[in-house]
Amino acid sequence: MKLGILAVGHKLPDWVAAGCAEYIKRMPRELPLVVQEIKPEPRAGKNREQLLAAERTRLDAALANYGCIVVLDERGVDLSTLKLAERLEHWMREGGDTAFVIGGADGIDPAIKARADDSIRLSSLTLPHAMARLVLCEQLYRALSVVRNHPYHREG
């Protein structure tokens, strides 16, 4: 099984890449975490629906290798770290590769949301794209540490 973060966007600042790389490195060999950048559609003369449809085509191609799709959405379920750990454990039991989709500036196409197995949000706050990617990497590592009883996460 592997976890994938499919993020619509451009190359992020070095500090974000370094932070993500640190948590990716900490993941065990049997549960690798990969980040794949999906090229955003150029805005020139296109409306929101056209932009999302073009990005959907790219996301669909990347999602073909994943059995479970989780979208990050501001209207998604608000999970605590322990609840995310429970979901991660469930996805691990299912055994298929799991993709986490972070949309671009205009969000995620409704067709991707409709076929997603789950919809979660990282925070009630609006996070910049770079921060969302880094927070997701850290939270997946933290959730795995809870599942594995590793001392990284401390309750209370």
Where are these regions (language model features)?
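Post-transcriptional modification and biogenesis factors for structured RNAs
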Residues: 1-156
